[in-house]
Amino acid sequence: MPHKRFVFILAITSLFNISQTIHAEPTPLSTLEEKKLTLEQQLGKQLFFDTNLSSPPGQSCASCHDIKTSLTDVIQNSPVSLGTVTGRTGTRNTPSAAYSAFAPGFHFDAEEELYIGGQFLDGRAANLKEQAKAPFLNPDEMNSPDEQSVINKIKTARYASLFKQVFGEQILNDSKKAYDKVAQAIASFENTANFNRFSSKYDYFLAGRVALSKLEQKGLDLFEDEDKGNCAACHTSKTEGGSQPLFTDYTYDNLGTPSNPEILALKGADFVDVGLGETVGSEENGKFKVPSLRNIAKTAPLYA
């Protein structure tokens, strides 16, 4: 039995490893046209990497969504991510921003009687644009006191003229409208091939361009077998309508996972992360969105 368990784990791990991006040839499936950024996407990139938009300065979106670790936190020995204020932390590990643009808008499926989509593990942001607004004002993240303070910094940023070129000469005079455009530009950047490469070995395998090793194929078989791993029941691995698989169905599940003692040590013994329940009501306590398994070999730690 121990030997079979080891083979199972090794096979599944091999499957996860093939979902990593291949940095050498062959040429990525995304086209060269997708890599050319519009002016709005260029602005979104500037905002995404601007470390001056936190208070105190020093943290940007890219600080916690680093390309080296598939757009998640580079700090892999902590169960939570660090904020710009020394000593402050979030309550979860940073989720990957890769492929997040494909999540459907947060909604309740009356037929299936469950919640689907949205951003964050608890679905508290309806879409990518709304998600982009949150970290700037979160005291445990970028800690800006209000929207106006963010816009004031943008007024003196090197890309202020680009902001006006994209959204109008007077846009920065209205902090509420300007802040909405900040989120729009970041979401637009996150919709580019920079975040959605679809260039893993598994993508090339689906396109018929490479073959899986015997161990990788065994991992895939276990992953999809309803009587064995059945991982694909939630982490979809098939192409649908010509689209590449995203390894999530964007639903919310309660797996009965106990509280992480490392998080309790930081947040207090009484801390409880109720997940979706915080967003829609206590009847959904303990449910969290099914995460994508793309690039999972790079996105540790693998607990919320």
Which functions belong to the PLM regions below?
Residues 2-47, 94, 134-139, 143-226, ...:
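Post-cleavage N-terminal segment of exported redox proteins
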